[in-house]
Amino acid sequence: MTDIVDLELRVLEESDLSSHLELLGHLTEAPPLSGVELANIADMRRRAGIVTKVFCHQPTGRIVGSASLMIQPKFTRGGRAVGHIEDVVVDPSYRGAGLGKALIMDLCEISRSKGCYKVILDSSEKSLPFYEKLGFRAHERQMRLDL
């Protein structure tokens, strides 16, 4: 585990995009994208209201942890919203230092402040204990159709 003293938790900035994409490669397939492609995707996400919080290593500018939040207004539940947390990832050298927990708690607090009645996320089997420690519980099942 690496020292976390030089880390800042903040919103993803345009200057972070390449480093963020590199970090996402620890989570899933994340092929290289051009600067223009990254900027276009970031703009679409911003317009959709998606918030991505990151841990930035201040001396190097490297992104070492991130998670995203999408707020979905509902017609049910009196119009209250649901927070969807996605793409939670921490660089392997920083795992166990509490970054994942801090990211999740920060996004849960944003969800609460936006009036969400619940926060949901998808998880691999191996990550279930981590989320359960944070108060999440397994509920229903996810379905998927690859296009």
Curated annotation (Swiss-Prot):
The species this protein was found in: Trypanosoma brucei brucei
Keyword vocabulary terms for this entry: Acyltransferase, Glycosome, Peroxisome, Transferase
Localization in the cell: Glycosome
Record field: catalytic activity: D-glucosamine 6-phosphate + acetyl-CoA = N-acetyl-D-glucosamine 6-phosphate + CoA + H(+)
Annotated function: Involved in the biosynthesis of UDP-N-acetyl-alpha-D-glucosamine. Catalyzes the formation of N-acetyl-D-glucosamine 6-phosphate from acetyl-coenzyme A (acetyl-CoA) and D-glucosamine 6-phosphate.
EC number, UniProt record: 2.3.1.4
Domain of life: Eukaryota
Applications reported: Potential novel drug target for African sleeping sickness as this protein is essential for the infectious bloodstream form of T.brucei. Therapeutic application depends on development of parasite-specific inhibitors, because this enzyme is also generally essential for eukaryotes.
InterPro entries: Acyl_CoA_acyltransferase, GNAT_dom, GNPNAT1-like
GO MF annotation, one: identical protein binding
Signal peptide, first to last residue: none
Consequences of knocking out this gene: Conditional knockout mutant of the infectious bloodstream form (BSF) of T.brucei has rapid discontinuance of growth and death by cell lysis after 48 to 72 hours under nonpermissive (without tetracycline) conditions, but grow similarly to wild-type under permissive (with tetracycline) conditions.
PANTHER family registered for this protein in UniProt: GLUCOSAMINE 6-PHOSPHATE N-ACETYLTRANSFERASE (PTHR13355:SF11)
Post-translational modification: Contains poly-N-acetyllactosamines.
Domain annotation N-acetyltransferase: ranges: 7-147
Binding site for acetyl-CoA: 88-90, 96-101, 131-133
SUPFAM superfamilies tied to this protein: Acyl-CoA N-acyltransferases (Nat)
Protein name: Glucosamine 6-phosphate N-acetyltransferase
Residues at which D-glucosamine 6-phosphate binds: 28, 86-88, 117-118, 122
Main location: other
Any GO BP annotation: UDP-N-acetylglucosamine biosynthetic process
